[in-house]
């Protein structure tokens, strides 16, 4: 048992160190860049050390617990703790944020503010994944919005203000329902608010109230995940944001919705989740097909990748809705797998469009010859995204498939139908990804452009790509490494649904 406040340090360090950026000497952007990257690296190393030496994988209970009284008036505590569900997400956050700060190297305008916002976002994400108090969870959920809004509206494309406003309206609208749910849960059945997750797990509610609470939380997560029809902010946002912001959005922000769905809706409201789960599976299946076919019609290749993200989120929703050991583990695996693959595809799309100043597929063609490295990595990650065996996407989708098929909750006919729909979605994925690769990289179009001096990716970009490629291959070959983190915790969680 470790009594050292590891998690508090992990949550507070980035935002505290980030606020010191403004006091650094004005000697160009180099100082700020190196300072930010060293903070991210330090945070990631601390995180890895704490989890390696102070976290027991065999123990399905909450570990590294911290509980400090914060606001006395209504008994609000700073409660942190992690288990197998949050461990993978926290490590993913550390890994992707460190590489995203390295990806943001070319940013020179207002770089201090940019890096501060990235570090503030880092704190919010770690805080969300490790909070054990419902109100603290909500505060961290909201802490995320402001940095993302500013990163979008200040360092984006031509329509950045439109997409930033759309993002804030959608997410703030979802947060209203979230807050109502938090207050309803905290105030039910007692005079003073009790928001401790440990206490709320044992709380039971009247059926109508539980369904209303579930629905309130679901709307907030449906915006973040996103679940159709609340997904329309995502393509606009990804189309306009700087690619380092896109890495954080695709890699971590979307996963917060899935994490909330498991952590709050599944754990605290099991009866309502049992009722809603068939609908989640149906929506997930529709989402896979709908987003894949919409992606096929996108002219802007950034938006095409954004819709592919929405499609892949469908597998997570199906895994969560299947209420089986295998399905939920598959959903957690897909959270990590898509975190790596989605972030890298946006990074590649951003670096490619920065070089060519073009985003429409019909204007592109023939870039594989001047940019062979970008072409190779783009093809490799597209293969990972379309679930090529040997890469993480394949394992995650396969495990979700098995989870749905073995689910005792669904009859054979609906299972067969949904599996068939998922299979069609998996066939559509290579169609839109390979057609995008063909239009971008093959042909001869760009050689007719005057002074076409394209530069291939340099050592910094290759370093980022290879760093992410290794875990994608690693998870694809040996998924047990990731599954072992969550398997005991998932079993404990599902014992509420199927009592022994």
From Swiss-Prot:
- The enzyme's E.C. designation: 7.1.1.-
Q: Which Pfam families match?
A: Proton_antipo_M (PF00361)
**What catalytic activity does the UniProt entry give for this protein?**
a plastoquinone + NADH + (n+1) H(+)(in) = a plastoquinol + NAD(+) + n H(+)(out); a plastoquinone + NADPH + (n+1) H(+)(in) = a plastoquinol + NADP(+) + n H(+)(out)
Is Ribonucleoprotein among the key words of this record?
no
Keywords of this entry: Chloroplast, Membrane, NAD, NADP, Plastid, Plastoquinone, Quinone, Thylakoid, Translocase, Transmembrane, Transmembrane helix
Q: Which GO terms describe its cellular component?
A: chloroplast thylakoid membrane
HAMAP family, per the entry: NDH1_NuoM (MF_00491)
Protein name, per record: NAD(P)H-quinone oxidoreductase chain 4, chloroplastic
